[in-house]
C-alpha cells in the first residue's frame, strides 16, 4: 500500500464530529516522481487496457480511485516509472519506463497488467457478488523508440479525458496525469508537449 506523507510544515486540523462524518473519502495521492524529458534506455512502453464488451465497470469515482491506486502501487513495487496515465469508465492508458531491457522488460510489463486486471476484477466481483464475471478484455502495448513518438503519446494520454469529451480541461480530471505534469514539469516541457499533434497516432481507443 502506498502512503502519501504530509509536508512537515502542514498544520494538523481538528474537525467537529459532524464535519468528519460528512467528509467523503477520495483517492488524493499522486505519482512520486517528476516527469522525464528523455526516453528510458531500458524500454519505454505505452499500454491500453479495455473492459470486456466496453462495459463501464469503472464508472464510479471510487473504482477509478481504486484502480489508479493499484497502478501506482504495482509500478512502485516493480520499479516502473510512470510518465502518463488516464483511467476512464471502460479503459485506461499509461506510459511508463521499464526497469529491465528486452524480453525481461516485456515480462515485467505483463506482470503489471496481469496483476492490475486480476486484483481489480477479483475485488469488484466480490463487491458485486458476481463470481467469475469477466471484467477485462485485453490490453495492447507499444514499445516507443523515438523521442517524438514519446512526446506525442505523452500528450495523448495526458489529455485523453478531453478526447473522450469528459472535460474541457484535462487538468480538472483527477484520474489522469495532466495536472501532475503541469505541477511537476517545467513550463518549457509542458509547452513542448502541447505543441505536438496527436490526430495521427495509431492507438487503440475506440471505447
Positions of predicted regions on the chain:
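Short catalytic/metal-binding and nucleic-acid-binding patches
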Residues: 1-207
Amino acid at each position: 500500500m502506498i502512503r502519501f506523507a504530509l509536508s512537515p510544515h502542514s498544520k494538523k486540523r481538528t474537525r467537529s464530529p459532524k464535519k468528519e462524518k460528512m467528509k467523503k473519502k477520495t483517492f488524493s495521492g499522486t505519482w512520486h516522481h517528476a516527469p522525464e524529458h528523455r526516453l528510458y534506455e531500458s524500454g519505454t512502453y505505452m499500454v491500453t487496457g479495455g473492459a470486456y464488451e466496453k462495459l463501464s465497470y469503472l464508472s464510479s469515482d471510487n473504482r477509478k480511485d481504486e484502480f489508479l491506486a493499484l497502478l501506482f502501487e504495482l509500478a512502485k513495487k516493480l520499479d516502473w516509472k510512470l510518465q502518463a496515465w488516464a483511467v476512464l469508465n471502460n479503459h485506461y492508458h499509461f506510459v511508463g519506463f521499464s526497469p529491465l531491457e528486452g524480453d525481461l522488460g516485456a515480462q515485467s510489463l505483463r506482470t503489471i497488467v496481469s496483476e492490475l486486471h486480476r486484483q481489480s476484477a477479483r475485488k469488484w466481483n466480490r463487491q458485486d457478488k458476481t463470481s467469475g464475471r469477466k471484467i477485462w478484455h485485453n490490453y495492447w502495448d507499444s514499445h516507443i523508440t523515438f523521442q517524438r513518438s514519446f512526446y506525442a503519446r505523452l500528450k495523448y494520454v495526458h489529455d485523453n479525458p478531453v478526447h473522450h469529451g469528459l472535460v474541457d480541461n484535462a487538468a480538472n480530471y483527477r484520474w489522469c496525469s495532466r495536472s501532475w505534469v503541469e505541477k511537476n514539469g517545467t513550463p518549457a516541457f509542458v509547452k513542448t508537449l502541447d505543441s505536438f499533434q496527436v490526430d495521427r497516432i495509431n492507438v487503440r481507443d475506440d471505447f
